[in-house]
Structures are given as structure tokens and as C-alpha cells.
């Protein structure tokens, strides 16, 4: 059975790169009816926090990436790592290193001055006796030959063993190192495939040798391409890439972000929009590219707008509620008629790219009054238009059935009686009702806003003019 894992370090929030790695592992597990395991790699105690662990888990849940086992925490397994490290030491596959951090740094600086790679010089490797000094445990790398990583994405990648230093597996304070913990955990958790960013590729030969030294078979490795900004620089906040939960708070749909992340390095023909079921069905590592993926914030925004169009109004109603409350358009605990709200959303969703934009647009259906944009006010609320607004108001007030058809008839009657163009009647009303010159059809806006709100808003502007 396929068993994969996502193993974030809780030294920050879950960002785009980590979320993409989590998604690829999740899709691979679901495609193969396997298991997806969540492991928290929290051995860096100085930087790992409970807040970040909670944030990562919240982001995973929001993305819908459910896990089958875990979350496991490395800090709960420290004695396990120590036991494996001492096993290697006893078998002569590792050795005690008595070099102090100061000595190591001094030699590193000297090597750099001489133009040599700043690697550990293995001076403690041949010390036979046990000294009464603090020590770290280093793994004995082979001194000759090559290590070939047969990567499922990159193909065969060869490393010279002589260029790989004897890495520390247990520090002098008794804490294990990343490369060692990963091997022990992946073996004990039965991981069959390690899918991770290509920045981990250089760790792979070290890990393979630790597997062999422990008498374990390494899993399959798949190193997925880096994500770059549109300027081909390493992805950062300046490219618009923020934490997963920031996208949630800005009004992105989780399905849209999942779709976007899936396409960062993986493709299926020219298809752009996938349901989760389709992603699970089509995903495989053969179609993960070798070239770096490019993060395009505009593309994500476009994709989100497409998802808003595709999402049923009933679901959008539930999703937009927190934004309406946050913006102050709806009070906590206040209820809206669902059918009415769905009509309002249907009229607006084609024009909105995020839930935040949708909530903002809904203000002119929910508030008694809206703020009018200065330029729109200057152009459409003046001595020429106020008489038209007054006549529209009088005729609308007389309507018994406040429907689009009846509203349209009133507008057309005024157009014909006064010899005006439709825009000369509709635009001033639109500006009063929405605060803007752009909106859904004006008859639809009035019908959804309702007679009371419409008249209240029109009379307020007329009285103030």
C-alpha cells in the first residue's frame, strides 16, 4: 500500500510551497487508495511553537487535506532517535566527534579562505578510545564511489560520496538532526514514497546511506520543482505569495487554491479547472515537470473568480457570511432570508473575484445608505438629474408590485415622456443605489434591494441636493 507523509516544521505558517507539497502527497495517496500521514517536525525547539502547529493544522483542514494518521510529533520520539544513533555507533557505522562549535567554525573559515568546500575534515573519525569530553555522533559516509538517486521526477541524479561530509546525527546536547530523524520516522511509519521540494535533493544521498547502514530499504523519492515568482526569483511575499490562511482571510475559496496549487508543476493536457475528484483521478508523478513552476498571483485571482461563478449561491451564502459580519454589513447573530440572499449573490457573483469583493458588493442590498464615489456624484447627482430622480421616486412609490418588469416600465415611460436616453435615467439611479457607475442591471438591483430601501435612498439624495 502507498504511504506518504507531509512533514512541516512549525517555525512559521503554512505557505504556498509547503501547501503544494502537502497537496501532491495527498493527491498521490488518494489516487492510489493509500494513506496520507501528517508529521510535525518540531525538533528545532528554539523556533517551533504551538501557535504555528495549530496554524498549520487549521490551514490543512481549510484546504480539505485530511490525513489518515497523525499528527505525530518528533519531540515525542527523542528516545527512539537516540537509540538508533547509538546502534550505529556500536556497529562502527558512526563515531564520536569531540570538535567544539568554535573549532568547527574556525576550520570552516580557513577552508573558505583557501577556496576549499567548508566540509568537516573527519579528524575524529579514526579516534578509537572514548574521551571524557562532550561529543556529537557523526555518521560515517563512504569515502569513495557514487550514490545514484533514481528520482521519480528528476530521473537519475549522481552524487560523489567524497563530496558528502560525515553528517552529525546526534548533537552533543542529545538532540537528533533533521536528516537522521527523517530516515528513522519514514522507516518506522512505513513510508513508501517521499514527495518533497527539490531543495531537499542534496539531502537524499545522505539519507539513503543512513537507510542502508540501519539495514532498511529506502523509499522511492520524488523531488518536485521549485516555485518561482514571475521574475524567476525565489518565491516571496513580494510576489503576492502569503500564508494559506491569509488567502482564506482575503476571500479565496479553498477549492480554487487547491486547483491553483495542483497546477504548479503538474499538468493534464490544457485543462485549467479541475474538481477535487478529477485531481485525484488524473494526478500522477509522471506528469510533474522538471522545470520550475511560476507563481502568478493574477492567475490565482482569475481562477478564484471562475470558482465563485461555478459555486452555487446557497454555498456562497454560507461562505460570505463571515465577511459580511467583518465588514459590518451584517450583525453577529442576525439572520438573512436565504432565498433573498441567494438572489442578491446571483446578481453579483459574475463580477466578483473574491468573497471579500462579494461581501463589499452586497452592501448596497443590505445597508440603508451607501457612500457615493465622488466622481460619480459629481457627474450624476446635479441640478439636471435631481428632477429625474424625483420623478422616478414618485412613480416607484406608487408601485404595488415592486418587480423588475414594473420597474423597467417606469424607466421606459420616463425616457419616452421626457425624450431622454435610458442612461440619463438609469445611471443617476444606479449611482444613488450602489454608490458606483458599475453594477448589475439596475432593475434587478432595485427589485432585490426592495421598495423601502430604494425609496429611502433616493429621497435622502434628493433632499440633500
From Swiss-Prot:
Coiled-coil regions, chain positions: none
PROSITE patterns reported in the protein's UniProt record: AA_TRNA_LIGASE_I
Cofactor: record remark: Binds 1 zinc ion per subunit.
Locus of motif 'HIGH' region: 8-18
Primary localization: cytoplasm
The keyword Aminoacyl-tRNA synthetase appears for this protein: yes
Residue window of motif 'KMSKS' region: 234-238
Catalytic reaction(s) noted: tRNA(Glu) + L-glutamate + ATP = L-glutamyl-tRNA(Glu) + AMP + diphosphate
Domain of life of the organism encoding this protein: Bacteria
EC number, UniProt record: 6.1.1.17
SUPFAM superfamilies: An anticodon-binding domain of class I aminoacyl-tRNA synthetases, Nucleotidylyl transferase
Swiss-Prot/TrEMBL cofactor(s): Zn(2+)
Disulfide-bond pairs as recorded: none
Gene Ontology BP terms: glutamyl-tRNA aminoacylation
Keyword Cell wall biogenesis/degradation: no
Binding positions for ATP per the UniProt entry: 237
One Pfam family, short name: tRNA-synt_1c
Keywords: Aminoacyl-tRNA synthetase, ATP-binding, Cytoplasm, Ligase, Metal-binding, Nucleotide-binding, Protein biosynthesis, Zinc
Gene Ontology terms: cellular component: cytosol
Gene Ontology MF terms in the entry: ATP binding; glutamate-tRNA ligase activity; tRNA binding; zinc ion binding
Subcellular location: Cytoplasm
Subunit structure and binding partners: Monomer.
Function: Catalyzes the attachment of glutamate to tRNA(Glu) in a two-step reaction: glutamate is first activated by ATP to form Glu-AMP and then transferred to the acceptor end of tRNA(Glu).
NCBIfam families with a match to the protein in the record: gltX_bact
Family: Belongs to the class-I aminoacyl-tRNA synthetase family. Glutamate--tRNA ligase type 1 subfamily.
Protein name, per record: Glutamate--tRNA ligase
Organism lineage: Bacteria, Pseudomonadati, Nitrospirota, Thermodesulfovibrionia, Thermodesulfovibrionales
Amino acid at each position: 500500500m502507498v504511504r506518504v507523509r507531509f512533514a512541516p516544521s512549525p517555525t512559521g505558517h503554512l505557505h504556498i510551497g509547503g501547501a503544494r507539497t502537502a497537496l501532491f502527497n495527498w493527491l498521490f495517496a488518494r489516487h492510489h487508495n493509500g494513506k496520507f500521514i501528517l508529521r510535525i517536525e518540531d525538533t528545532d525547539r528554539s523556533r517551533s511553537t504551538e501557535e504555528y502547529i495549530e496554524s498549520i493544522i487549521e490551514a490543512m483542514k481549510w484546504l480539505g487535506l485530511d490525513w489518515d494518521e497523525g499528527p505525530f510529533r518528533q519531540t515525542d520520539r527523542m528516545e527512539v532517535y537516540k537509540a538508533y544513533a547509538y546502534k550505529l555507533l556500536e556497529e562502527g557505522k558512526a563515531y564520536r566527534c569531540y570538535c567544539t562549535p568554535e573549532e568547527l567554525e574556525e576550520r570552516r573559515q580557513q577552508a573558505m579562505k583557501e577556496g576549499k568546500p567548508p566540509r568537516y575534515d573527519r579528524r575524529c573519525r579514526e579516534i578509537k578510545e572514548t574521551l571524557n569530553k562532550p561529543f556529537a555522533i557523526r555518521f560515517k559516509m563512504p569515502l569513495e564511489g557514487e550514490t545514484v538517486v533514481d528520482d521519480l521526477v528528476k530521473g537519475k541524479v549522481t552524487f560523489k560520496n567524497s563530496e558528502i561530509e560525515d553528517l552529525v546525527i546526534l548533537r552533543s546536547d542529545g538532540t537528533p538532526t533533521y536528516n537522521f530523524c527523517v530516515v528513522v520516522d519514514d522507516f518506522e511509519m512505513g513510508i513508501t514514497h517521499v514527495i518533497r521540494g527539490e531543495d531537499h535533493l542534496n539531502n537524499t544521498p545522505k539519507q539513503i546511506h543512513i537507510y542502508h547502514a540501519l539495514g532498511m530499504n529506502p523509499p522511492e523519492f520524488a523531488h518536485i520543482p521549485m516555485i518561482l515568482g514571475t521574475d524567476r526569483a525565489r518565491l516571496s511575499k513580494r510576489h503576492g505569495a502569503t500564508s494559506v490562511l491569509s488567502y482564506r482571510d482575503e476571500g479565496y475559496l479553498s477549492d480554487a487554491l487547491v486547483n491553483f496549487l495542483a497546477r504548479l508543476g503538474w499538468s493534464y493536457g490544457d485543462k485549467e479547472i479541475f474538481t477535487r475528484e478529477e485531481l485525484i483521478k488524473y494526478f500522477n508523478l509522471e506528469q510533474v515537470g522538471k522545470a520550475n513552476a511560476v507563481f502568478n498571483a493574477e492567475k490565482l485571482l482569475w481562477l478564484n473568480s471562475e470558482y465563485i461563478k461555478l459555486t452555487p449561491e446557497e454555498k456562497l451564502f454560507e461562505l460570505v457570511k463571515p465577511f459580511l459580519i467583518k465588514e459590518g454589513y451584517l450583525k453577529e447573530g442576525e439572520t438573512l432570508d436565504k432565498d433573498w440572499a441567494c438572489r442578491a449573490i446571483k446578481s453579483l457573483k459574475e463580477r466578483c473575484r473574491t468573497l471579500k469583493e462579494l461581501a463589499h458588493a452586497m452592501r448596497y442590498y443590505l445597508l440603508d445608505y451607501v457612500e457615493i464615489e465622488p466622481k460619480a456624484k459629481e457627474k450624476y447627482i446635479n441640478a439636471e438629474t435631481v428632477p429625474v430622480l424625483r420623478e422616478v421616486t414618485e412613480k416607484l412609490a406608487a408601485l404595488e408590485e415592486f418587480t423588475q418588469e414594473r420597474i423597467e416600465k417606469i424607466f421606459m415611460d420616463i425616457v419616452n415622456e421626457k425624450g431622454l436616453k435610458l442612461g440619463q435615467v438609469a445611471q443617476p439611479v444606479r449611482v444613488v443605489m450602489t454608490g458606483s457607475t458599475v453594477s448589475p442591471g439596475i432593475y434587478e438591483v432595485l427589485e432585490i434591494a426592495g421598495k423601502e430601501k430604494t425609496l429611502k435612498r433616493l429621497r435622502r439624495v434628493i433632499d440633500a441636493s
